[in-house]
Swiss-Prot record:
Belongs to the UPF0301 (AlgH) family. It comes from Colwellia psychrerythraea (strain 34H / ATCC BAA-681). Coiled coil: none annotated. InterPro entries: AlgH-like. This is UPF0301 protein CPS_1252. One of its GO terms (cellular component) is cytosol.
Length: 210
């Protein structure tokens, strides 16, 4: 089987694990040692703003949350005011449960923007970063243009994902920026299946992967 990196993994009704019910998972890594991905449609009851309040900036780190004393909020420039609104809105997005493994660890899937301490290039359009510097930059002008934040990740051992695909537990489709960043969380599973031309009402256990 060819690598499923940069693919979306769509849970089928036949998948027996309730944790992954109607989930869409972005596959970050897939090789002979197994696979690793982030669920992109399983929100937890915490906003990004709430999460950032729990993170202490490193000594000398000047990128933090926007607050009433920020220079951004003091500007009368219309473009700056719009920027502050956009930043505020981005901080109100919900954090996602990326999977059942390492649920205290944060992962940021974002549009391509280098310069972080610990990043992996996933495609021309996407990167994943796990270092603290990007978390502290979220909510500032230094943040990537598009991003989602997850706690935890999903993992498969050698051959495990291949077996689950053969059992028709998953469908696959190439990653779509529209689904990742612009589609409401609750609609991502539906949009991903529609991309394959599948009618949700006719999904059954005898459908193989795409």
């Amino acid at each position: 089987m060819s690598s499923l990196e940069n693919q979306l993994l769509i849970a089928m009704p036949s998948l027996g694990d309730p944790y992954f019910n109607k989930t869409v998972t972005y596959i970050c890594e897939h090789n002979e040692d197994g696979a690793m991905g982030l669920i992109i449609n399983l929100p937890v009851n915490i906003t990004l703003a709430d999460l950032l309040k729990q993170i202490e900036p490193d000594e000398g780190d000047k990128t933090g949350n926007v607050n009433s004393n920020s220079e951004l909020t003091k500007s009368d420039d219309v473009n700056d005011i719009t920027l502050v609104t956009d930043i505020t809105n981005s901080l109100e997005q919900l954090v996602l449960a990326g999977g059942p493994i390492a649920q205290q660890r944060g992962f940021v899937l974002h549009s391509s923007q280098p310069g972080w301490s610990s990043s992996l290039v996933l495609s021309k359009e996407l990167m994943i970063t796990t270092s603290k510097d990007i978390l502290m930059a979220l909510g500032t002008q230094q943040a990537p243009e598009q991003f989602i934040v997850t706690l935890g990740y999903a993992g498969w051992g050698p051959g495990q994902l291949e077996q689950e695909l053969q059992a028709n537990s998953w469908l696959t489709t190439p990653a779509d920026i529209e689904i990742l960043f612009k589609t409401p969380i609750e609609q991502r599973w539906k949009k991903a299946t529609e991309k394959l031309g599948i009618d949700l009402a006719h999904l059954s256990t005898d459908i193989g992967h795409a």
